[in-house]
Amino acid sequence: MSEKFDVVVIGAGPGGYVAAIKSAKLGMKTAVIEERKVGGTCLNRGCIPAKAMIHASTLYREIKEADRFGISASDVTYDFEKILEYKEQTTGQLVQGVEQLLQANGVTRYYGKGTLFEGKKVKITGNEEQFVEAENVILASGSKPLILPIRGMDLPRVLTSDELFKLSEVPKSLVIIGGGVISVEFATVYSALGSKVTILEAMPRLVPNMDKEIAQNLKLILKKRGVESHTSAAVQGVHMEGDTCVCTFVEKEKEQTVEAEYVLCAVGRCPNTDGLFAEGAAPDMERGRVLVNDKFESSIPGVYAIGDLIFGAQLAHAASAQGIVVAEQLAGKEPSVNLDVVPGCVYTDPEIASAGITEDAAKEQGIKVKTGKFIMSANGKSLITKEERGFIKIVADEETDVILGAQMMCARATDMIGEFVTAIANKMTVAQLLKGMRAHPTYNEGIGEALEEAEGGAIHVVPKKKK
């Protein structure tokens, strides 16, 4: 006799485990099925380990540059084995924390692979096979690295992000195919640790989904740190010459090659649906993704999908928010999270963050806008820490004063973007957001200055000469 649950979640990544815990908190009998460590890609092979390595590598670079603060540090070195240990300890601690939260909230944890059968039955394939039944099933099996369909992608020195994390030594040189978030973050890490990094991006600019000015600044900053970037570069393939990877690409109609010890394929991710559906049990899908309605319900009543399995933002925090909303809906409650405003963050140095729409996007939609921009070189905290390169820009509706978007490239941008997410989600105006006093000296003062600039003039900005 199979056990019955109100909610069965397949996958315990940031979408799945959050959906499971929220469902349990709302009084539903809940189970979660996961064949690997809880936390999914984000916790084990993505966000957290990457940011740990960014922190370590940035700290190494800052110590080498400490002379500008009057600090002498000669013969500074790093121990990559210990950096990897620190990364593993960090992820391990968080994984253990998630396991404890599942247990503390009464979520039944099944170890194994979950496969959906007809009638909302789920087979768990682990040490032994068993079935569970569910009133509602939430599919949250996440994604896996996307591999380009070009020659050489199966070579042993051509890696995905999963495999790059497993390297025990820093590559002497690294070619990164793709110029998105994953690419520029790994470029930040390995260039700081001494690798010669080259980025090949097919689009006209790096981080193409971000503001154009941010992309231009990022390319210059990476170049200053020794990272070579080629945009509008179509990669043709990779071959080996001895132990060296040779990557062929076309840029401005000219075929070129670049050599490296390793090649990283970082062109995005695709849904992980391997073994997820038994024959005849799959819902309607398109290009490998589950099609859902505005309540995240698939074509099969009572079967929901969230996160990287569906179209939309492929981000850990988006998946978590969707998991919360689905659980709330199943409990008959109104959603507590506005899913329309998704912050985007890039953990380069300086950090990049955005929310809402850009000025160009607003104009394309026919919206008359006003903008406010503050250059962080005039911010006291930025000068103290010598992180003065960057800016904060806000976009607001010219007629209603409602904030539509914000783009930031500065220290702690990823920590500060939440203020704008809250403002945009609640349709706050520039005037309303200016009501709050900001502490001094903080990076956050830059937000106030950008808002003031949109209203007619920031205090710490030289006014434009009247014509």
Regions found by a protein language model. Name each.
Residues 8-15, 19, 24-36, 41, ...:
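Flexible, glycine-rich terminal cap/loop adjacent to redox cofactors
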